[in-house]
Amino acid sequence: MGIKGLTKFIADTAPNAIKEIKIENLMGRVVAIDASMSLYQFIIAIRDGDQYGNLMNESGETTSHISGLMSRTIKLMENGLKPIYVFDGAPPELKGSELEKRGEKRQKAEELLIKAKEEGNLEEIKKQSGRTVRVTKKQNEEAKKLLTLMGIPVIESPCEAEAQCAFLTKYEMAHATATEDADALVFGTKILIRNLNANASSNKNKNKNSSKRGYILTEINLEQVLKGLKLTMDEFIDFCILCGCDYCDTIKGIGSKTAYNLIKEYNCIENIIKNIDQNKYQVPANFKYVEARQSFIKPKVLEKSEVKIDWCEPKIEELKKFLIKEHNFNEVRVTNYITRLLKARKVTTQRRLDTFFTTCTKKSTKLIIEENQKEVLKTKSKGKKREINNDNSTKLNAKKKKTNVKDEKKNNEKVDEPKNKPNENLVKDEDDQDDYDQNIFDERTNSESGNIKNENVKEDISSSDITMDIPKCINDIVC
């Protein structure tokens, strides 16, 4: 379930924290993906025929999760992402009552699905089919095997996958968490990516507008959320518990807006309980908000030293055997997927320019480029001055020689007249007006982008000069 109404509340109250991005914006980024959520989406989305049944092999076993996972992973890699899949471990004890409720809802949906099939109600069949889906242990193991054979890193969380994903961003081992569960923000993920598998469905179920707009994702920035809501992380956690989470019941009569106002006034749940009118707001008898809070602050996750992220070469022959022989995939289709996989691996090895600079130095990319360009200008300025001085000397000698010839003629005609002195004003070269001022770079440069504004200055600095000097700058600052 995640946090009830959280995304909408953030969109309304802290709109700067949410933005739409294209998948290209994540090129070169490591993204920690909630594997269980992805498998659930694939099983729901990829259907066969009008009865909305899962894709199956000859043995009657579901293969929608395998087909979707393989296709989507390759697509992400083709767009330059480096996916890490994180699988759920044992569910926390606090989640027991929530899981029971989900089981009851699933059972009811199965009954409604049987009735819809008897009546031939296709719309109801589609609706209830999605509600009956659950990812089995066997499907999880098959997904892990597939990813391992593809050479994709797999991490098994001791508990909640989204919590482990969030901590990977805290460890700076991943850029973002990809899941539909907003509680990843409460676990502290720096960036939350939603809709990563939005286009995972078959052609029949695809959104026709998605291809026109491109592959659009939703990005939520936790730092901007806290800034926009003007809450500390501890206050944000208590706010989310009051909104409604998987770990405990909540106070009846309190929605997201009321919860936010109460947190702003009283700062924490303890103070809220002391001050609210309990006739108006019914506090649960066994309100385990303290345990829920601790589950968000200190969830069961692997420590940084325990996390092993291995990018391996695909095991092609084993992958073919797994797909073709064990799950009856079409051989031509599998060959096509493997060809795409091998090509996509080359794309994921490309590094982002900004991450390269970040790992080298704490200076910003803009500052490094500006400093490097100034060094180029300084060198060129010195060279230009030398040329001007040499040119001046040559012209001075020529003028002196010319003057001496004139003087000699005059001396021959008028011996009594003194020799003429060369006019110093004639020696001054009009090219001196173009002597380069080193400070001109700062005046003629766009401080935001580092691009040179003045075309004349731009002619003095060729793009090849700058690109040749930047690697030297990089080498100088690498630790």
UniProtKB/Swiss-Prot annotation:
Protein residues bound to Mg(2+) 2: D181, D183, D246
BP terms from Gene Ontology: base-excision repair; DNA replication, removal of RNA primer
Region entry N-domain, spans: 1-106
Its EC number(s): 3.1.-.-
Biased composition (Basic and acidic residues): 404-428
Gene3D superfamilies in alphabetical order: 5' to 3' exonuclease, C-terminal subdomain (1.10.150.20), 5'-nuclease (3.40.50.1010)
Residue span of region Disordered: 378-460
Chain sites annotated for binding Mg(2+) 1: D34, D88, E160, E162
Annotated Gene Ontology cellular component terms: mitochondrion; nucleolus; nucleoplasm
The record's account of how the chain is modified after translation: Phosphorylated. Phosphorylation upon DNA damage induces relocalization to the nuclear plasma.
Entry keyword set: DNA damage, DNA repair, DNA replication, Endonuclease, Exonuclease, Hydrolase, Magnesium, Metal-binding, Mitochondrion, Nuclease, Nucleus, Phosphoprotein
Compartments it resides in: Nucleus, Nucleolus; Nucleus, Nucleoplasm; Mitochondrion
Cofactor note text: Binds 2 magnesium ions per subunit. They probably participate in the reaction catalyzed by the enzyme. May bind an additional third magnesium ion after substrate binding.
Molecular functions (GO terms): 5'-3' exonuclease activity; 5'-flap endonuclease activity; DNA binding; magnesium ion binding
PROSITE patterns documented for this protein: XPG_1 (PS00841)
Residues that coordinate or bind DNA: R47, R72, E160, G244, D246
Region (I-domain): 124-266
Chief location of this protein within or outside the cell: nucleus
Cofactors required: Mg(2+)
Subunit structure: Interacts with PCNA. Three molecules of FEN1 bind to one PCNA trimer with each molecule binding to one PCNA monomer. PCNA stimulates the nuclease activity without altering cleavage specificity.
Purpose: Structure-specific nuclease with 5'-flap endonuclease and 5'-3' exonuclease activities involved in DNA replication and repair. During DNA replication, cleaves the 5'-overhanging flap structure that is generated by displacement synthesis when DNA polymerase encounters the 5'-end of a downstream Okazaki fragment. It enters the flap from the 5'-end and then tracks to cleave the flap base, leaving a nick for ligation. Also involved in the long patch base excision repair (LP-BER) pathway, by cleaving within the apurinic/apyrimidinic (AP) site-terminated flap.
Family (UniProt): Belongs to the XPG/RAD2 endonuclease family. FEN1 subfamily.
Name of protein: Flap endonuclease 1
Organism: Plasmodium berghei (strain Anka)
Name of the coding gene: FEN1
